[in-house]
Design a protein with these regions (language model features):
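Extended extracellular/luminal ectodomain segments enriched in beta-structured repeat modules
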Residues: 424-430, 528-535
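Solvent-exposed helix-loop boundary motif
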Residues: 1-65, 69-107, 111, 123-128, ...
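Primarily the internal scaffold of c-type cytochrome electron-transfer domains
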Residues: 7-16, 21, 73-87, 194-196, ...
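Disordered, acidic Ser/Thr/Pro-rich linker "stalks" and the adjacent N-terminal cap
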Residues: 368-416, 439, 465-530, 631-656
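Primarily short, surface-exposed interaction patches in extracytoplasmic proteins
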Residues: 92-128, 132-167, 181-228, 289, ...
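Surface-exposed, glycine/proline- and aromatic-rich loop segments on solvent-exposed faces
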Residues: 415-417, 422-488, 492, 818, ...
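Extended surface/linker regions that mediate inter-domain or inter-protein docking
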Residues: 67, 154-292, 298-303, 434-436, ...
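Exposed low-complexity, polar/acidic, P/S/T/G-rich flexible segments that act as propeptides
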Residues: 433, 446-469, 533-535, 539-543, ...
Length: 978
């Protein structure tokens, strides 16, 4: 350990009996006189233990001596001992027992002078169990059928039907995806999107099929290593291809890979073992018997992966693999063939245009040589000297010897430069703006981005005016803007289009640290009178101080339809007999300036992009390298400081490795779910129990180590763990057992007595009452509104969210286009999960960003949550959906019947008289207001464009019902399981 000087530990038996550097055993069982621990405790010199504070009392020393005399036995931490079934405890209230679970919980209650609460009524129970098993409330039809069923097995029939529903896997996958840190993007600042949704679908399908949990584990850890692995088994390994991946500039690919392997080790520890492994990558565990070397033994199982990023010239990286193609349908193949045919046609057209252009090359040479004239003739561009300048921001400017202006001071957020220059003599046909470098600029420039210090600029608009003596300024229209380079999604045309929006601009990422230029022709050339000035206005409206750092202006008497000749090209033109290599350079330069060719090249690029867009979908999978990597312990987790070599292995504090297991991920998966493992079944059962009751039998679901909360019902936890394994690791059988227990079926009503005796419901004296998770709240409202789509699987979906949320997030800023079809109303498990910007309503209800393994979500209560339910576009649509359902399902019903129907759809119970009265008053007051203000209903309904309804519905009634529905969806009871 990092503070341990003599390598002696007394917290674990093997270390105490072994001793430290002195090789003297701290504890010799039965012999206190020879035990170094007693020698140190009784010492009065520098070797006394404890070294600081008061010495042990005589009573404490006597206790220590008796303990050593008795054999110095250490009690092993309960979680590291194999679970065993204990006999079912006897209880007094036998009539309240429905299955073995109740023996354990009721016995604990009776020992405290307590008993179960009364059973929940049928309406509350079916809503609770439906929410727990499928994440959705029952339909009115399901509710009525259950209420009418008086058979003894009525509840069992409901549970069986829910377990067989495909909605079961969709609901329970959510918790596993939190553990798997599943997301549709890389994470970090770049946060590019990536395809891994096939793994999400695999989890849903596996849970619906009740795949035995041991097989579920093995396939995720090492499914690709199973002999003749199926597509499904390979897709399962996506579990460990979901870590974040940093592809930003400055990241070392090997460091990135090592960090991902660290993540795989710690996530495995949390998910299956309930062990906090993060600290062990740097030092041995402070509280549990896991040495740093053992961390790297597990690391070795996952260390045979290839690099998962590829570089772009050292500036940045792309996440790329390994991947596996998904089975494609005929339609995809036809689309790809059509796109490839279109690409070939464009490529032929481009080749023909190149041949035509090359035929005119000699004419171009002659014309350009004539322009240049003899050696030493005047250059094409005349540099203009600035005479006045100012900025709307806080910039100051310094005029340099080359007539450029160097910006200094703070870079304004959205600065507008106004720079006057001398006008050229004679004809003015075009102007040029150069953005030059300087040592004082970030990375030498050419921009002054103050947001993150990189040298980018975003120039939104350039305007030019002629200032003649004694006359008003004359705006000069600019056309045909050309630049030497422009960042993707930005173009030269934006400089002069007058739009002034964020994307209509010129930017130069990632071509930093080099000068750039832009040329613009005048729509009508002018001849300034002597003494005239030119006024250049440079508008930087993007924000963040992304301003030009050192502008210089030039003018020409000729249009700048072709880019200005670089000096190297001009020098070659002046040569009477250029070499073949030099002639090739001239030809290449000429072809680059051909606008027709440029347009065709863009068309070819677009066709190539389209081919890429219809590529066969793929998914991320684990792949083993042919030659295993060498694994070394890394000092303090630093990949640049490797120490001793280690082989794959497992912690000695847990069950031993079997010889028949291969020393790879597949073998490690089998070790995890071996019945001798004391942790996995306990950890998994405890986590599922928490989903039903709100808290695990062990409250620290992520930590079963020595610092964990002790189990409230240890015998129950062990009984469930063994029962789980005995039943073939069946998830559904365990869930059925919990759902049909009297413990689960109690009323959740809280009495003063229960608050006093069991305020946190640790002893399960009442049923669970919990706020729903983020996805459940949305899914619940979709089901209530009648909008829910039951379409399963496939790529992530894009429900509505506030505009522009993704605009400033991630590299290349992928656009968020809200779905307009049924994908808009699909379940939360399918919603796009972007780590840098998760779906906002999920965030508001405590959804994680999934940048790491997340074993348990928090439950907060904030005003923002109520505002989300009232005003979020998705919930507004759902409120209108519910209003339409009420009017269309109950066309001839009276008001109270409609209100009761809406209430039952929402809460699965009949409203009380006072509740009905409140809703009636709300509806009638809103209807009166809407009839008085005739435009309000139309404005409301016209604004909810995604929801279609019959023109036969009265708009005032529909709008009034919208407000009733909006209120029902925002009730605390609606978003609570009780």
């Amino acid at each position: 350990m990092d503070r341990q000087k003599g390598e002696l530990r007394l917290d674990f038996e093997e270390f105490a009996f072994k001793g430290g550097e002195s090789e003297l055993a701290a504890v010799i069982p039965g012999n206190p006189e020879k035990s170094e621990l007693m020698v140190r405790v009784l010492d009065h010199g520098d070797d006394r233990m404890p070294s600081k504070g008061d010495p042990l009392t005589k009573a404490q020393v006597d206790t220590l001596r008796k303990w050593i005399e008795g054999g110095g036995k250490y009690a092993k931490h309960w979680a590291y001992m194999k679970p065993e079934k204990s006999p079912l405890p006897e209880v007094k209230a036998k009539e309240r027992v429905s299955n073995p679970i109740d023996h354990f919980t009721l016995a604990r209650l009776e020992a405290r002078g307590m008993t179960f609460s009364e059973p929940a009524d049928k309406a509350h129970w079916i809503r609770r169990v439906s929410l727990d098993l499928v994440g959705l409330p029952p339909t009115v039809e399901q509710l009525d059928a259950f209420l009418a069923d008086d058979s003894k097995d009525a509840r069992e029939k409901v549970v069986d039907a829910l377990l067989q529903s495909p909605r079961y896997g969709e609901h329970w996958a959510r918790q596993w995806l939190d553990l798997a840190r599943y997301a549709d993007s890389n994470g970090f600042q770049a946060d590019q999107l990536r395809d891994s949704w096939a793994f999400r679908d695999w989890v849903i399908e596996a849970m619906n099929a009740d795949m035995p949990f041991d097989q579920f584990t093995i396939e995720q850890i090492g499914g690709d290593l199973i002999p003749k692995a199926t597509f499904s088994q390979q897709a399962a390994t996506g579990f460990h291809r979901t870590p974040t991946c940093n592809v930003e500039a400055g990241v070392h690919p090997e460091e990135n890979r090592v960090n991902q392997v660290f993540d795989r080790v710690t996530t495995t520890g949390t998910t299956w073992l309930g062990i906090t492994m993060e600290c062990v990558q740097c030092h041995s565990h402070k509280y549990d018997p896991f040495a740093q070397e053992e961390f790297y033994k597990i690391f070795a199982f996952f260390n045979n992966t290839p690099l998962e990023v590829k570089g772009k010239g050292g500036v940045s990286f792309d996440f790329w693999g390994p991947t596996m193609d998904l089975p494609s349908d005929k339609g995809q193949k036809n689309q790809k063939q059509a796109a490839e045919t279109a690409l070939k046609a464009k490529e032929k057209e481009l080749e023909a245009a190149k041949r035509d252009s090359e035929a005119k090359f000699e004419d171009w040479l002659a014309a350009e040589r004539q322009k240049l004239g003899k050696e030493g003739s005047a250059p094409l561009w005349t540099v203009l000297k600035p005479t006045q300048w100012k900025s709307s921001g806080k910039e100051s400017f310094t005029l340099l010897d080359d007539n450029s202006l160097l910006a200094g001071g703070m870079s304004g957020a959205k600065s507008i430069y106004e720079i006057e220059t001398e006008a050229p003599e004679g004809k003015l046909a075009s102007v040029r703006l150069e953005t030059l470098l300087h040592d004082s600029l970030p990375s030498k420039g050419p921009g002054r981005n103050r947001t993150n210090g990189n040298p980018n600029f975003v120039l939104t608009e350039v305007t030019l005016s002629l200032l003649e003596p004694g006359k008003k300024p004359v705006p000069l229209k600019l056309t045909r803007a050309k630049v030497d380079y422009s960042q993707g999604n930005f173009s030269a045309k934006g400089l002069i289009d007058g739009k002034r929006d964020l994307r209509s601009a010129w930017a130069i990422a990632t071509e930093f640290s080099k000068p750039h230029w832009a040329t613009m022709d005048l729509a009508k050339p002018v001849e300034p009178t002597p003494g005239s000035k030119l006024l250049f206005k440079l508008e930087h409206l993007y924000g963040g101080g992304r301003n030009v750092g050192r502008p210089r202006f030039s003018a020409s008497s000729e249009p700048a339809r072709q880019p200005a000749l670089p000096k190297a090209i001009a020098d070659l033109l002046r040569k009477p007999k250029p070499t073949a290599k030099e002639s090739k350079k001239l030809l290449d330069h000429y072809l680059k300036g051909d606008e027709e060719l440029a347009d065709l090249e863009k068309a070819v690029a677009a066709a190539k992009k389209k081919v890429g867009q219809v590529k066969v979908a793929s998914t991320l999978v684990m792949v083993e390298m042919d030659k295993p990597r060498e694994t070394r312990v890394m000092a303090r987790g630093n990949y640049l400081d490797p120490k001793q070599t280690v082989s794959p292995g497992t912690p000695t504090a847990l069950h031993p490795w079997k010889k028949e297991w291969p020393a790879n991920r597949l073998g490690f998966g089998k070790w995890l779910v071996d019945r001798e493992n004391p942790l996995v079944a306990r950890v998994v059962v405890n986590r599922w129990w928490s989903q039903f009751f709100g808290s695990g039998i062990v409250a620290t679901e992520e930590d079963f180590g020595s610092q964990c909360e002790p189990p409230t019902h240890p015998q129950l936890l062990d009984w469930l763990a063994v029962e789980f394994m005995d039943n073939g690791w069946s998830m559904k059988k365990l869930h059925k057992l919990i759902a049909l227990s009297s413990t689960y079926g109690q009323s959740s009503r809280v009495t003063p007595e229960l608050l006093e005796k069991d305020s946190d419901n640790l002893w399960f004296a009442r049923g669970p009452r919990l706020r729903l998770t983020a996805e459940m709240i949305r899914d619940n409202a979709l089901r209530i509104s009648g909008l829910l789509s039951e379409k399963m699987g496939g790529p992530p979906v894009y429900p509505p969210q506030p505009d522009g949320l993704w605009r400033q997030t991630g590299r290349n800023e992928p656009k968020y286009a809200a779905a307009t079809n049924e994908d808009r109303f699909r379940r939360g498990v399918y919603v796009i999960w972007r780590r840098a910007a998760p779906y906002p309503s999920f965030v508001n209800f405590d959804g994680p960003d999934r940048s790491s393994c997340h074993p348990k979500r928090s439950r907060t209560n904030t005003p923002l949550q109520a505002l989300t339910l009232l005003n979020d576009e998705a919930y507004v649509e759902m409120a209108l959906g519910l209003a339409i359902r009420v009017l269309e399902d109950k066309t001839k019903a009276e008001l109270d019947e409609r209100l009761s129907y809406a209430f039952r759809r929402t809460l699965s119970r009949e409203p009380e008289a006072r509740e009905l009265a409140v809703l009636r008053e709300l509806y009638e007051s809103e209807l009166a207001r809407l009839r008085k203000d005739k435009s309000s209903s139309k404005e409301l309904l016209d604004g909810i464009k995604a929801i279609k309804f019959s023109a036969k519905l009265d708009p005032n009634q529909l709008a009034a019902w919208f407000f009733v529905a909006n209120t029902l969806l925002n009730l605390d009871e609606t978003v609570t399981k009780g």
